[in-house]
């Protein structure tokens, strides 16, 4: 059984001194994160990604669009936006590549290939370009992701909850596609999680965040509408050992994320200050839970997974 990533740590140490074998490759834990746009992987699961990479796991990130419809922070690259040159998507490939490198992941993977589906924009924005991901044929999209599951055979799959975290159409569609792919794939995914934000965890992070830039709008945890209460959460990953990697990845997404000088908070194009917590939370959708702590939470997404 897999406990606290101990097997991965041993394998990583052996590989560091030149010892490798097909059996070792089979024993390496594999985690797949499915996200809607470049930067989502970092904002919601960046600490977890870096945490497991540090422990020798094989981690892959699948991104469903290039984020072409995103707003751009600052003047330097503002004309890349959809209303000007419409070159933001290509630029965000470079940002995603740099962010993944900061997290320890080799390269991005795009569902259907880069640009196969376009960012749908928010629900109230016009459909200026097709094909939008929100309109993707479910059989095609889920089939492509199921093929990735069958090839990679992840022990853990992570995506959004049915509301897409905060309601973005592409996040909701990513949830639907991933859920359908997990059901369709021949590979039986041992554990399937939603990434969620904890009210208590964010409250703790708000309480300790300091030196927030004056130009950012400061809010409280009560102003954040999409948080989960503790009784709805199944797992927490302490990412304090990987927070520097997460902050570096955030800074790589410079057209989308501003990061405070001290790395304790960030803001998107809305300039609303949000703390960067040292924990990331999850809901277990399918699979057997591993050992739980006093709160009733797993502290390792791989807990209880048999790698053999």
UniProtKB/Swiss-Prot annotation:
Annotated GO MF terms: N-acetylglucosaminylinositol deacetylase activity; zinc ion binding
Cofactor: how bound: Binds 1 zinc ion per subunit.
Keywords from the UniProt entry: Hydrolase, Metal-binding, Zinc
Domain of life of the organism encoding this protein: Bacteria
Residues annotated to bind Zn(2+): 37, 40, 171
Signal sequence interval, chain numbering: none
One Pfam family, short name: PIG-L
Transmembrane segments: none
EC number: 3.5.1.103
Enzyme class at the top of the EC tree: hydrolase
GO biological process per UniProt: mycothiol biosynthetic process
Reaction(s) catalysed (UniProt annotation): 1D-myo-inositol 2-acetamido-2-deoxy-alpha-D-glucopyranoside + H2O = 1D-myo-inositol 2-amino-2-deoxy-alpha-D-glucopyranoside + acetate
Requisite cofactors: Zn(2+)
Function, in words: Catalyzes the deacetylation of 1D-myo-inositol 2-acetamido-2-deoxy-alpha-D-glucopyranoside (GlcNAc-Ins) in the mycothiol biosynthesis pathway.
Family according to the record: Belongs to the MshB deacetylase family.
Protein name per UniProt: 1D-myo-inositol 2-acetamido-2-deoxy-alpha-D-glucopyranoside deacetylase
Name of the coding gene: mshB
């Amino acid at each position: 059984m897999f406990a606290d990533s101990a097997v991965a740590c041993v394998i990583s140490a052996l590989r560091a001194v030149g010892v490798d074998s097909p059996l070792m490759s089979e024993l390496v834990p594999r985690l797949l994160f499915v996200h809607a746009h470049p930067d989502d992987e970092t904002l919601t699961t960046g600490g977890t990604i870096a945490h497991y990479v540090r422990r020798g796991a094989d981690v892959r990130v699948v991104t469903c669009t290039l984020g072409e419809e995103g707003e751009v922070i600052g003047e330097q690259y503002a004309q890349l936006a959809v209303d000007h040159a419409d070159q933001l998507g290509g630029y965000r490939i470079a940002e995603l590549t740099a962010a993944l490198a900061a997290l320890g992941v080799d390269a991005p993977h795009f569902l259907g290939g880069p640009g196969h589906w376009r960012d749908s924009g928010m629900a109230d924005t016009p459909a200026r370009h097709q094909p939008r991901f929100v309109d993707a044929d479910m059989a095609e999209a889920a089939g492509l992701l199921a093929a990735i599951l069958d090839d990679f055979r992840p022990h853990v799959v992570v995506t959004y909850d049915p509301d897409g975290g905060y309601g973005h159409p592409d996040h909701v569609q990513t949830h639907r596609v991933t859920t359908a792919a997990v059901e369709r794939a021949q590979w039986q995914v041992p554990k399937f999680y939603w990434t969620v934000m904890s009210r208590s965890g964010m409250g703790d992070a708000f309480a300790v965040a300091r030196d927030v830039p004056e130009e950012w709008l400061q809010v409280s945890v009560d102003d954040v509408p999409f948080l989960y209460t503790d009784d709805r959460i199944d797992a927490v990953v302490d990412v304090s050992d990987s927070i520097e990697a997460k902050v570096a990845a955030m800074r790589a997404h410079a057209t989308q994320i501003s990061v405070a000088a001290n790395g304790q908070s960030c803001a998107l194009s809305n300039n609303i200050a949000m703390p960067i917590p040292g924990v990331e939370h999850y809901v277990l959708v399918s699979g057997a839970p591993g050992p739980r702590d006093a709160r009733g939470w797993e502290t390792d997404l791989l807990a209880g997974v048999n790698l053999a």
